Amino acid sequence: MQQQPQPQPLPHSSYYTQTESELLQIEAGGTGLTFPPHRSEMAATSSQLQQASMSSNVASTATSSNLDVPSGGSTGSGSGGQTTSHFVSPLQRRHCQPPSHLPLNSVASPLRTASYKTAAAVAGHGFHHSHHQQLDFQRNSQSDDDSGCALEEYTWVPPGLRPDQVRLYFSQLPDDKVPYVNSPGEKYRVKQLLHQLPPQDNEVRYCHSLSDEERKELRIFSAQRKREALGRGAVRLLSDERPCKGCEESLSGGDIVVFAQRLGAQLCWHPGCFVCSVCKELLVDLIYFQRDGNLYCGRHHAETQKPRCSACDEIIFSDECTEAEGRTWHMKHFACQECEHQLGGQRYIMREGKPYCLGCFDTMFAEYCDYCGEVIGVDQGQMSHDGQHWHATDQCFSCCTCRCSLLGRPFLPRRGTIYCSIACSKGEPPTPSDTSSGPQLRPTHRASTSSQIARSPRRSGDRDRERESSRKANHGHGPVKGTGSAGDLLERQERKRMEAAGVADLLLGGGVPGMPRPAHPPPIDLTELGISLDNICAGDKSIFGDSQLTSSMPDMLLSKAEDSHSYQSIDKINLNSPSNSDLTQSTQELANELELDNDPVRELPHDGYEQLFANNRNTKKGHELQDMQGEEDGEQLDNRPLKEVRFHSVQDTMSRSKSYTDNSNARRRRRRRNQSRSSSEMQINQTNLRLHNAQTQAGTGTGAHNLLNNLDNCDVASICSTCSSSSSSDMDDYVYRLPARKHYGGVRVAYVPNDALAYERKKKLAQDPSLAAAASAAVPGVPGVMNESKNCTIS
């Protein structure tokens, strides 16, 4: 094929006309023949394609410029020989293509045929023979039966079809892809022409910055593709049943199908199945390229042989190229899409198939943190949800209420913010069940407390060892008070006092034979409580934030090993509200009273100490341990007013630690919750500090009687009828514990019932009238007191 020098046409228009002419040459059998186009022919066909792509009327192109005038080399006798080589006998003319030197846009249009006939009539005497054959071809064409049916409603139609066959063909295509004039289908066709048949793949003049070697290689590449792979589909009716090559469905006789000669005469496709095997788009104007039995558009067929630059959209003929993200670039074209800085060997970010340097990407596409408002750089971690973005840090990606980190944890989005739990989303403080992270807001000292409570008689050496172990256990919770704690100080004072009374040897020796040990561990001394509370509140810190809590609370619970008072303990005290003076006012008065209590104790000789327990044994004869203990308590408390110490505090909104109690405590405690919004008040009923002196009032004489009178006059003495009525049971060795509670935004009131033994005693009294009458006669007034204050209420 000879290279013809051509003038510079309008972009793309002459290129597509030339491509179609080459296809017509191939299918008409004149592959090796070339017809040099005349300048007027190029200008005419260029204007026609341009007007078709601009949605103009086809009828406006019916001018005399449609005449294809052969060049000087094709006139005379040579012209007749070349013209007759494109035609066959009239029997085969129905399925033949028009002459190759006719533009494709001039085929199958009555208006174009009329203009062609008019122009041919004035062509000159040298073209009469060719003119008669062309007129004969038009008259016998099935695409024009001179019936007056206009096909100009389409910008392109398959060649060689009657109007009804044209409509049958287009009925097999989607409506938005049928090339009606001034329709989306026409725009689709023009777009696919530019995309499927890129001119830079075939013509050097449409390429940029090609070297001489690359220009030569492009010409060879284009000629080889046209010679080996280029073809055009033929549309006609099917005569027998065949399967569709695209969808494998059966085609029956009479269906309109598309044939591709380069893939074989037996293969056919539905009109809608004649698509590119890569992009799956309809092959525009039925122009295809084949390779290995597959159909390709011009673009993707070229890419099967050479890489294409993603920047300039040209075939890469150089030996080196850049590959990234499954794409290829010329070495000099791999640059930032914004600043055009070359990115070879540098970091980059791909967005929508285009590379960007880090600076340009941050400027154009960086997100802002929803928490701190700062830019989230490409080097920083990012968390995104529903259009919101955060830095992937513990500070930014955290709960909106409690600020706990949500990295690696499920979160709850609500109203544009994120939370760690439902409680936090409602504005409530987190509970232990809602979150497992974060510091423990409420210190736990129950393990050390329960280890110091004696449930059976034991030696003072064992108590010292337990006390030492409890101090070591509490060392992790906060700083230990050391040897100057309130519990150690009072214990040494009591030991000196008992030695002066002559009882120290008795206690250290494990007890005198015949004299029983006290059945209960000693109670809490409120002077010790006052010292501990004073130490706690010295820095105006709450019980939840004070590091001295766990060191002072165990000291508060330490008891004097030599004493034999009944024992009750305080488990939970809220110290948020009261000041130092409020907390220690009542305890200071009690300390003054206790100084008076020491004198009768010092006057007790060995026989007095023995007499104290002898009276206790005589009292218990004939009754069970639990019943008689309650009656003795009631006898001492009959005519005495009830006192109590109250600790007022603000509402505790912090999460409480889990209560670690044994099964016996859990069985004798019930928990009920009542939701309210009022402020809470904690009321703690303290036990009688000198209950054994009251029990031995009849046997000890005037000293014990004076002690009881001192207790009556004490304004701060607290007597809980519940605790005193059940003080004879072994279950009272345990500390009364508040049940763990969950906060839901309001105050909870928990009612702690009596222990199981006291409850059982009440049932026995109710079932046995004789026992109830005896108890009422022995201790009048006690049942009334017990019924009135049966429960210790913590609100």
Swiss-Prot record:
LIM zinc-binding domain residues: 242-306, 307-367, 368-430
Note the CDD domains from the entry.
Answer: LIM1_Prickle, LIM2_Prickle, LIM3_Prickle, PET_Prickle
Q: Where is the composition biased (Polar residues)?
A: 650-662
Please list the residue ranges that the record marks as compositionally biased, kind Basic and acidic residues. 459-471, 637-649
The record places domain PET at 135-243
Region named Disordered: 30-96, 427-487, 616-684
> Where along the chain is composition biased (Low complexity)?
52-66
* Domain of life the protein comes from: Eukaryota
Q: Where is the composition biased (Basic residues)?
A: 666-675
Q: Name one GO molecular function term.
A: zinc ion binding
Question: What protein is this chain from?
Answer: Protein espinas
